[in-house]
Amino acid sequence: MILDVDYITEEGKPVIRLFKKENGKFKIEHDRTFRPYIYALLRDDSKIEEVKKITGERHGKIVRIVDVEKVEKKFLGKPITVWKLYLEHPQDVPTIREKVREHPAVVDIFEYDIPFAKRYLIDKGLIPMEGEEELKILAFDIETLYHEGEEFGKGPIIMISYADENEAKVITWKNIDLPYVEVVSSEREMIKRFLRIIREKDPDIIVTYNGDSFDFPYLAKRAEKLGIKLTIGRDGSEPKMQRIGDMTAVEVKGRIHFDLYHVITRTINLPTYTLEAVYEAIFGKPKEKVYADEIAKAWESGENLERVAKYSMEDAKATYELGKEFLPMEIQLSRLVGQPLWDVSRSSTGNLVEWFLLRKAYERNEVAPNKPSEEEYQRRLRESYTGGFVKEPEKGLWENIVYLDFRALYPSIIITHNVSPDTLNLEGCKNYDIAPQVGHKFCKDIPGFIPSLLGHLLEERQKIKTKMKETQDPIEKILLDYRQKAIKLLANSFYGYYGYAKARWYCKECAESVTAWGRKYIELVWKELEEKFGFKVLYIDTDGLYATIPGGESEEIKKKALEFVKYINSKLPGLLELEYEGFYKRGFFVTKKRYAVIDEEGKVITRGLEIVRRDWSEIAKETQARVLETILKHGDVEEAVRIVKEVIQKLANYEIPPEKLAIYEQITRPLHEYKAIGPHVAVAKKLAAKGVKIKPGMVIGYIVLRGDGPISNRAILAEEYDPKKHKYDAEYYIENQVLPAVLRILEGFGYRKEDLRYQKTRQVGLTSWLNIKKS
């Protein structure tokens, strides 16, 4: 199994290193035969001798083209003759490539920016992470002593915790009497002990949570200050900091540094990405948070250190558990795109598609298009096109709703209509499909590069799903599931890749044709469903729709929906297929992207309504949840309105307990960097003035008091609120918390703010908003 690949330099020549695990043992293989190269397209092949003479200079050394080779390739499907220009060292490429490009005989150069080690994997057909090796995983986390305003790395590391499949432990340098705590004499000894543990346990994968930005850089700073070499690489090297776009990434040679933060922010959508929030979202279990000021206070006073140690140990344990949860999918993506796990776990979906295409282009003898220049990139950013169709919802409360959607709409369109840069407006084509509204033509005489690859991916996914049904082995079933999910993620990213401004195979015409066909097919479904089957379509968004038959019985609606699916699929071309996705007992649609439905088991699905961020008070969240439940479970909008009025009345009468009023916001930067002073910053500054250490990442809970002046001046720490001394600002909580939360729902039924605040009789047709068609 290939874990990673890089190259070193020996006597001026590059040497590829493959970091591998075979039969349970780690080894490094070397290849001294692979040479860097670029492609050049010449106006006149007889000028190659002139091109061969082009030289450059690097570190005082003359850089030359050491060999050339004429090769027959394809470019966007068309035959092309190019020259392969070999160089001595990968670092010679940036030195000489522009001189080659500017030569009068050269039309253009290609594939000059593919990193050498990645090029090796592609050309040799090697796939990282393939094989059945058992990988050793170790997670770690650090706790530091931080005081407000201190520069990064100034305060000591006070604890290093680590976890693997056998244990979770903490190393520290103050006496803490707990079975999982190891006490050493100093910070220096703690770091050295941690290095020994890494060497003893010899993990293949080191898991961190934000280790690229925090744990590793902090560890490196402290180690440098204390005169320690962080030799944790399997070749005896120290961690290497690299720039990837706007971020720093840390590489450990021979061990895969798997930073969960990048993977999780790409994979799941959460209001906040603290370790605690992520752990609770994934496992459904809360994890205690101990804040920086509490850690500092405990360390400096020597009190409550057991709590800090437990928190540190649980951090490492949580990181390990999350690693086990997310690694299998990333390993499958690594295999799928053929690049190392370290890179894949830090890649956007656009980059994953690109690495997949680069490998497939090489296999099909295609020269890859170049990345855009800065000027071209800016031009692409300015381009726009019409997206998917969204129908304004039919407002009110509806019953017996079916949800129908297209199976992989955009990938199916790309394959069915052969939408690809190499088939676009192809001269001499006899058969082509014309995109509706936009008019772009796609040739059907030859299979397009991207549609054919996408077709193979979807075929493979279908085979895997069949195999999943057949296999009796639960482990195999889990692994197959990760594989099909990886394929789905990649396949669904191709449409977005066409419009990705940095893409090599960028194609705005392709992207806008895909959405145009998408609009055509969903509108066809809408028309046929209403005109021929008597449904009323309530809401459409891109590839799916909600519909009902007003006054219809639930079983009749389900039956007719299934009949319609069979009917429409016989009319749809190619791979396009509509599916019956679900039945909902009740639902309402407020505006585009904002709706809620409840299924027959009582499961509520909402979009665009829920207030999950922590800067909403508990009273706002609780009231919204009660309103949702009353409408969806009981079908009673008027009761929901009564609940809101009751809560508003209780707020006005100061009957709401303070714990339901606290608003929580995170401090995201040092206090002196804030220009706009929000309530949480104002409270944090008051705490800092009292000597409390405020650190980025801390969450401040505050309550807004009654009075004059800006809200920031009237916010106090939630824990300091005393009902005997303080009065909360009822008007603030009514206007800025409860009403905005419930109006997200109730405005869909024609209610306005003033209808909820005051006991007025509604004169105008409430029933016209409800539209309840009882079955």
Curated annotation (Swiss-Prot):
<comment type="subunit">
    <text>Monomer.</text>
</comment>
<dbReference type="GO" id="GO:0006261">
    <property type="term" value="P:DNA-templated DNA replication"/>
</dbReference>
<dbReference type="Pfam" id="PF03104">
    <property type="entry name" value="DNA_pol_B_exo1"/>
</dbReference>
<keyword id="KW-0239">DNA-directed DNA polymerase</keyword>
<dbReference type="InterPro" id="IPR006134">
    <property type="entry name" value="DNA-dir_DNA_pol_B_multi_dom"/>
</dbReference>
<dbReference type="InterPro" id="IPR017964">
    <property type="entry name" value="DNA-dir_DNA_pol_B_CS"/>
</dbReference>
<comment type="function">
    <text>In addition to polymerase activity, this DNA polymerase exhibits 3' to 5' exonuclease activity.</text>
</comment>
<dbReference type="InterPro" id="IPR050240">
    <property type="entry name" value="DNA_pol_type-B"/>
</dbReference>
<keyword id="KW-0378">Hydrolase</keyword>
<keyword id="KW-0238">DNA-binding</keyword>
<dbReference type="GO" id="GO:0003887">
    <property type="term" value="F:DNA-directed DNA polymerase activity"/>
</dbReference>
<keyword id="KW-0548">Nucleotidyltransferase</keyword>
<comment type="similarity">
    <text>Belongs to the DNA polymerase type-B family.</text>
</comment>
<dbReference type="InterPro" id="IPR006133">
    <property type="entry name" value="DNA-dir_DNA_pol_B_exonuc"/>
</dbReference>
<dbReference type="InterPro" id="IPR036397">
    <property type="entry name" value="RNaseH_sf"/>
</dbReference>
<protein>
    <recommendedName>
        <fullName>DNA polymerase</fullName>
        <ecNumber>2.7.7.7</ecNumber>
    </recommendedName>
</protein>
<dbReference type="InterPro" id="IPR023211">
    <property type="entry name" value="DNA_pol_palm_dom_sf"/>
</dbReference>
<keyword id="KW-0255">Endonuclease</keyword>
<keyword id="KW-0540">Nuclease</keyword>
<dbReference type="InterPro" id="IPR043502">
    <property type="entry name" value="DNA/RNA_pol_sf"/>
</dbReference>
<dbReference type="InterPro" id="IPR006172">
    <property type="entry name" value="DNA-dir_DNA_pol_B"/>
</dbReference>
<dbReference type="GO" id="GO:0000166">
    <property type="term" value="F:nucleotide binding"/>
</dbReference>
<dbReference type="Pfam" id="PF00136">
    <property type="entry name" value="DNA_pol_B"/>
</dbReference>
<keyword id="KW-0235">DNA replication</keyword>
<dbReference type="GO" id="GO:0003677">
    <property type="term" value="F:DNA binding"/>
</dbReference>
<dbReference type="InterPro" id="IPR042087">
    <property type="entry name" value="DNA_pol_B_thumb"/>
</dbReference>
<dbReference type="InterPro" id="IPR012337">
    <property type="entry name" value="RNaseH-like_sf"/>
</dbReference>
<keyword id="KW-0808">Transferase</keyword>
<dbReference type="GO" id="GO:0004519">
    <property type="term" value="F:endonuclease activity"/>
</dbReference>
